[in-house]
Swiss-Prot record:
Topology in the lipid bilayer: Multi-pass membrane protein
Organismal lineage: Bacteria, Pseudomonadati, Pseudomonadota, Gammaproteobacteria, Oceanospirillales
Full protein name: 4-hydroxybenzoate octaprenyltransferase
CDD domains cross-referenced by the UniProt entry: PT_UbiA_COQ2
The family this protein is said to belong to: Belongs to the UbiA prenyltransferase family.
Keywords (A to Z) from UniProt: Cell inner membrane, Cell membrane, Magnesium, Membrane, Transferase, Transmembrane, Transmembrane helix, Ubiquinone biosynthesis
GO annotation, cellular component aspect: plasma membrane
Length: 284
């Protein structure tokens, strides 16, 4: 039982916030591609795929960080740096979760299967970027957004649809914004051990850049709504998101670690709010 608990911690099954943040834009894409009537077996496949692939991403992330996590207060007790899970076990778990994700995508179509290989590559690449660039959050944004063209493809959507790629870019902006809040919690430790992040790159302008990224996200989501002819309820949900983003800024204004982490967590409500507005729009 202790080993299962360690695996759950390594895969973040016990902390599903990252899976939710990946799930919401995936569901946005399914609903947009299907004009509000997605095939329910695809909804199930993608929700399961989100949780399995995000868990695989967490495992490979901790494997990549195994040499430095022991020097960071927040991560020093994770299964790998503490020795509760071996490197071999971590790699086997990553492979198992990746295979599970691939089995799920086999229930879609060839085009989506081919797109999934790009998604796997992005998920495996992201954890190593923090050693080479101050923009690892950009690579996370690309990895978290790749489910969007996959969802469009599985639903039979047009991959040249501008709404698809606007949603892709909007989600990249949103991901960089909320993961910068997350990186702000580790900034003092990261500076000591040489790990790079947007929180370090943006420095004293971190909150200003986050606000700009959130503004770009909402602008693109508004444009998508106009192009799709969505109901006014969708735009109300975006106005609510403005309030949620302001609350995050106000909460993190003093850059307290716990406050920044709460601002990161609050983005689950943003994703949920946009989804509710989208679903409500298609019901009207």
């Amino acid at each position: 039982m202790n080993k299962l608990k360690d695996y759950a911690e390594l895969t973040r099954f016990n902390r599903p916030i990252g899976s939710f943040l990946l799930m919401w834009p995936t569901l946005w894409a399914l609903w947009l591609a299907a004009d509000g009537m997605p095939q329910w077996h695809l909804v199930i496949i993608f929700i399961l795929g989100v949780f399995s692939m995000r868990s695989a991403g967490c495992v490979i992330n901790d494997y990549a960080d195994r040499k430095v996590d022991g020097f960071v207060d927040r991560t020093k007790n994770r299964p790998l740096p503490s020795g509760r899970v071996s490197e071999k076990e971590a790699l086997m778990l990553f492979c198992a979760l990746s295979i599970l994700s691939f089995i799920l995508v086999l229930f879609t179509d060839l085009r989506t299967i081919l797109l999934s290989f790009v998604g796997l590559g992005l998920a495996a690449l992201y954890p190593f970027m923090k050693r080479y660039t101050h923009l690892p959050q950009l690579f996370l944004g690309l990895a978290f957004s790749w489910a969007i063209p996959m969802a469009y493809s599985a639903q039979g959507g047009d991959l040249t649809d501008p709404k698809l790629w606007m949603l892709f870019v909007a989600n990249c902006f949103w991901t960089i914004a909320y993961d910068t809040y997350y990186a702000m919690t580790d900034r003092p430790d990261d500076l000591k051990i040489g790990i790079k992040s947007t929180a370090i790159l943006f420095g004293q302008y971190d909150l200003f850049v986050i606000i700009c990224l959130q503004g770009l996200t909402l602008s693109l989501l508004t444009w998508i709504g106009l192009l799709a002819g969505l109901h006014w309820l969708y735009f109300v949900s975006l106005i609510v998101c403005v309030g949620l983003f302001y609350q995050q800024f106000k909460q993190a204004k003093e850059r307290d670690r716990q406050a920044c982490f709460r601002s990161f967590l609050d983005n689950n409500r943003v994703g949920y709010c946009v989804f509710i507005g989208l679903v409500a729009s298609y019901f009207m």
